[in-house]
């Protein structure tokens, strides 16, 4: 529509026909719903009752490189105890439902159950600071590549080499054992490999047990399967698996049982630079160098280094100090399911290996063959905990949730799920060993009550070491101090003795 030219106000109105187009945007369906994991704070009620639990002085002594076996029966006479091993303590707690509680009305045993929550921990470490040395009498070191050196064509260029490892301090607390990761030998496809080919690598998750070797600076590998010459790494790991905690998997655990919280401090630098002796498995590409007329083949270009953890200091210690658990990284906020917790410790700052000497023959003059030298390593621990008493009301919804999480918990609380009723009549023979009847089926093996019975841990039983007198223990006093509570000492006032009444004198008038 148009307005006249003589009009004062001129306006133009244009109309556009609507045009339909198909919807070109993608339609996204909602994701598949997943079961929601509840935090323990939702269905667990904390009380104001606290207990202290502590171990005795824990000591271990052994050889730092390998186990020593007797020649006769092949029995281990001296175990392997190294400062570069994991110490996984399996701490067993008393059942609070069988505990003598100060208040009988604290919970209802018909509908509720008691459990422990760890709220404080302190790992005490004895022994002085020191650096442990490891090595190999036949270490695969061909040349010192840090300095100029002509390639050595010897068939056996192994030498005596020793070194100190990467410095590690590690601390993991949970109600399940920690999960470790390492690279192992994978499986090759049929017909795709030949003798001498590089083995395929496979990422592997395993449970970290007590005595497993930590990652020392040579990688988290299965050295027994991936290094057949047994000389690429020192003696204490050349036939072992070095594991590294899988922090990613433990942090992604829906329940968070393997790691309530963790502390770690790692430190390393490279000290020496070597190359490996042997034939080169991967050919060096021609475009990476100009060929020489004097040297037909280049030297070994498989370079390696020796690690070093550098200086140890008391100012950088993670141990001998308390830690308080307010909020765990996962949904399990410190609940000790199954009345157990696992404490994983690594401390390479106290890895000193001591030398012991014994005399073979007595002579006046010194002769090296007259003495036998031995090597030992010692460790000392002291574990202290603060536990809070908690209660859980077992409603049908909570029981179903716990059954999906861990069915053994309800069985331990005498809330087992009854089996379905059987409509058929069962046959039971009297004499099972009699040859007059048909052969009976073997009895199925009983499932072990302890799911960790086949694993190796350092068992610490605290069943008889709980106490409510927190002010009588160092960690308990620290706990009371950070809560702002002071220990009270009740003193009874001495009973006042009744004084004998004084007889009044009669006034006598004179």
From Swiss-Prot:
Disulfide bond as UniProt keyword? yes
Q: Which GO terms describe its cellular component?
A: host cell nucleus; T=7 icosahedral viral capsid
**A Pfam match:** Late_protein_L1
Q: Where is this region: Disordered?
A: 490-510
Q: Which UniProt keywords apply?
A: Capsid protein, Disulfide bond, Host nucleus, Host-virus interaction, Late protein, T=7 icosahedral capsid protein, Viral attachment to host cell, Viral penetration into host cytoplasm, Virion, Virus endocytosis by host, Virus entry into host cell
Can the keyword Disulfide bond be found in this entry's annotation?
Answer: yes
InterPro entries in the record, alphabetically? Capsid_L1_Papillomavir (IPR002210), Capsid_L1_sf_Papillomavir (IPR036973), dsDNA_vir_gr_I_capsid (IPR011222)
**Recorded GO terms, molecular function?**
structural molecule activity
**What coarse category fits the chief subcellular location reported for this protein?**
virion
Q: Name one GO biological process term.
A: virion attachment to host cell
Where in or outside the cell?
Virion; Host nucleus
Q: Tell me the protein family, please.
A: Belongs to the papillomaviridae L1 protein family.
The record describes the protein's role as: Forms an icosahedral capsid with a T=7 symmetry and a 50 nm diameter. The capsid is composed of 72 pentamers linked to each other by disulfide bonds and associated with L2 proteins. Binds to heparan sulfate proteoglycans on cell surface of basal layer keratinocytes to provide initial virion attachment. This binding mediates a conformational change in the virus capsid that facilitates efficient infection. The virion enters the host cell via endocytosis. During virus trafficking, L1 protein dissociates from the viral DNA and the genomic DNA is released to the host nucleus.
Subunit structure, as described in the record:
Self-assembles into homopentamers. The capsid has an icosahedral symmetry and consists of 72 capsomers, with each capsomer being a pentamer of L1. Interacts with the minor capsid protein L2; this interaction is necessary for viral genome encapsidation. Interacts with protein E2; this interaction enhances E2-dependent replication and transcription activation.
Protein name listed in UniProt: Major capsid protein L1
Gene source species: Human papillomavirus 57
């Amino acid at each position: 529509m148009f307005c006249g030219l003589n009009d004062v106000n001129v306006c133009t109105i244009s109309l556009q026909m609507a045009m339909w187009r198909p919807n070109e945007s993608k339609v996204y369906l909602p994701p598949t719903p997943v079961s929601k994991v509840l935090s323990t704070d939702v269905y667990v009620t904390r009380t104001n009752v606290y207990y202290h639990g502590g171990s005795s002085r824990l000591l271990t002594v052994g050889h730092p490189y390998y186990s020593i076996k007797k020649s006769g029966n092949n029995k281990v006479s001296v175990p392997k105890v190294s400062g570069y091993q994991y110490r996984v303590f399996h701490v067993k707690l008393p059942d609070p439902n069988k505990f003598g509680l100060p208040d009988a009305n604290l919970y209802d045993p018909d509908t509720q159950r008691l459990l422990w929550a760890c709220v404080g921990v302190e790992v005490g470490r004895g022994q002085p600071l020191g650096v442990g040395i490891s090595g190999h009498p036949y270490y695969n070191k061909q040349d010192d590549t840090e300095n100029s050196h002509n390639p050595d064509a010897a068939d056996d260029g192994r030498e005596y080499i020793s070194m100190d490892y990467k410095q590690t301090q590690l601390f993991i607390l949970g109600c399940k054992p920690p999960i470790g990761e390492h690279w192992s030998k994978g499986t090759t496809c049929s017909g795709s490999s030949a003798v001498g080919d590089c083995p395929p690598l496979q990422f592997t998750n395993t449970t970290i047990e007590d005595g497993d070797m930590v990652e020392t600076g040579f990688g988290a590998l299965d050295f027994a399967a991936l290094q057949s010459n047994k000389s690429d790494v020192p003696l204490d790991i050349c036939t072992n698996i070095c594991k590294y905690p899988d922090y990613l998997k433990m942090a992604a655990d829906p329940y968070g049982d393997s790691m309530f919280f963790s502390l770690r401090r790692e430190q390393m630098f490279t000290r020496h630079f070597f190359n490996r002796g042997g034939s080169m498995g991967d050919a060096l590409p021609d475009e990476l160098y100009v060929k020489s007329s004097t040297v037909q083949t280049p030297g070994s270009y498989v370079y390696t280094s020796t690690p070093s953890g550098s200086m140890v200091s008391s100012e950088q210690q993670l141990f001998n100090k308390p830690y308080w658990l307010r909020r765990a990284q996962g949904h399990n906020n410190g609940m000790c399911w199954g009345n157990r917790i696992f404490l994983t410790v690594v401390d390479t700052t106290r890895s000193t290996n001591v030398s012991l000497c014994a005399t073979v023959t007595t002579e006046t003059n010194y002769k090296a063959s007259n003495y036998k030298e031995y090597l030992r390593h010692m460790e000392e621990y002291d574990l202290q905990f603060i536990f809070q008493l908690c209660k859980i009301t077992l409603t049908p919804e909570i029981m179903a949730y716990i059954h999906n999480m861990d069915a053994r918990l309800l069985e331990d609380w005498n809330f087992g799920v009854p089996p379905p009723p059987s409509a058929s009549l069962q046959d039971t023979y009297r004499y099972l060993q009699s040859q007059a009847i048909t052969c009976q089926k073997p009895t199925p093996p009983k499932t072990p009550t302890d799911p960790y019975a086949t694993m190796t841990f350092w068992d610490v039983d605290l069943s008889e070491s709980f106490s409510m007198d927190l002010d009588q223990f160092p960690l308990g006093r620290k706990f009371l101090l950070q809560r702002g509570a002071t220990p009270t000492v009740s003193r009874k006032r001495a009973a006042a003795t009744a004084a004998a009444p004084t007889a009044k004198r009669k006034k006598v008038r004179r």
